[in-house]
Structures are given as C-alpha cells and as structure tokens.
Amino acid sequence: MHRATESARPDAVFRDPLAERLAGDHGRAIVDHVPRTTRNGWWLVARTKIIDDAIAEAIAQGCDRVLNLAAGLDTRPYRLNLPPDLTWVEADLPALLAEKTQVLADEVPRCRLTRTAVDLADAAARDAFLNEALDGATKALVLTEGLLMYLDDSDVSALSAALQRPEVRWWMLDFAGPGLKKMMNKKMAGMLANAPFKFAPDNGLAYFENLGWRTVQVEALYSAARRLRRLPLVMRPLGWL
C-alpha cells in the first residue's frame, strides 16, 4: 500500500501503477494498524528507490539476469525500464505466486519474466531452483528484499553459501541492526507474532564480508529517506548521522 501512496504523489520518486491493485483491502488494513511513526512508509519508499537505482546500475554494467527471492508483491518487471531480453526470475511460495499471477494476468512485463514456486527454506529445493534459474547467466543479480530479517543466522549463512557461485555477480540485500530488531519486535509485537525479526548481526556488514562477500555500495534507509525528502520531521536528526 505504501508504494501505491507514493505513486499517487505529484513528486513521487517512483511510479508503481499496480501497487494498489495488489495490496487491496488487506494491504490497507495492515497500514492502518502499524505504529504512527512508520505509517507513512518512509522506510519502504526509501528501500524501493535504493533497489530500483541499484538494479539500473547493475544492468548498465552488464547484468543479464535478476533473481528476486521471496518476491512477494514486487512489480519491478512491469514498471522499470528494462532490456526486453533480460531474464527476471521471481521465486516465492506457491499460493502467493498463484494469486499474483492471477491478479496480473492482463499485464505485460517489460522483460522475460518467469515465476517459480519454491520453499527457499528447503535447501535441496533452493539449490535445484538456483541451478535452473541461473543456467546460462554470467552476471546475475540476486535480490532478497525484506527477507533476511525473518531468517535465523544459520539460514542466512546457508543462503550466502548457496549464492556464492560464478554466475552471481551481485547480492542486493537489506538487514537490520540489533537495536531496530528489538524496537520492531516490541512496537509491532502483534503484527510480527508469526514472523518476528530474527536476523540482526552485531557486526553489521562485516557479517557478510566474513562470509566472503565484498561490499560495493551501502546506504542507511533513514539517510536515503532524508535525501528523498520522505523522512518524518521527528526523525530528521538521524539523517545527519
């Protein structure tokens, strides 16, 4: 719903014409029950724009495939300026992908879009999916937007190992720190009861560097939100940190 709200602004930083259709009444109900400080979705707007720009930059550098793991209601294949011959693969649970495919049945993606139903928590199923999805790729970007914070440390480590293969050039991810994890699990205890924040490494980016990854670009959400003029007034001092 936050993407739909942003898209309706005259100064929108991105346009997602399909967001409202996908969110529906359920999405509006969720927004109505979140804490007031996060209700305007500044963090989601910032994250969306950061990832949009990172994908565009990767494509300019020769990215030939995008894998969106736990793709959810993402509509980038329909709204970004993408090469028609780019292969974009969405992976998520069967029921979610089936509903999404039905809702978007009359829409045409701007690239070669495929969807694969897979339980990414199943190591064998995940590896089989990656083998198929990355076949023929040479510079793939893997996106795990809004996923890692719900995983255990061991699951993140296993996913990292699975993605360390020659076809993968970039891993675009987001994660929270221990302080945000504690605050979110407390403020949104009811909403997060079935999916609490779990992964929040004490050592931040060093966690991934210790697993063999090299940091190319990083930006805090509050910093991006301030740059985009979306950070709530009460939080603006954070943008200077």
Residue ranges of predicted features:
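Rossmann-like AdoMet
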Residues: M1-L67, A71-V118, A123-E132, G136
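Conserved catalytic loop of SAM-dependent methyltransferase domains
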Residues: V216-G239
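A short SAM/SAH-binding and catalytic strip from SAM-dependent methyltransferases
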Residues: T138-S154
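Short acidic, glycine/proline-enriched helix-loop-strand junctions
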Residues: N81-T87, M191-N194, W213
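Short alpha-helix
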Residues: A195-S223
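A short, conserved alpha-helix within the catalytic core of class I
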Residues: L113-R115, A123-R126, Y150-P166
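Conserved beta-strand signature within the Rossmann-like core of class I S-adenosyl-L-methionine
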Residues: L141-L143, L159-G179
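Short, glycine-/aromatic-enriched active-site segment of Class I SAM-dependent methyltransferases
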Residues: P178-A195
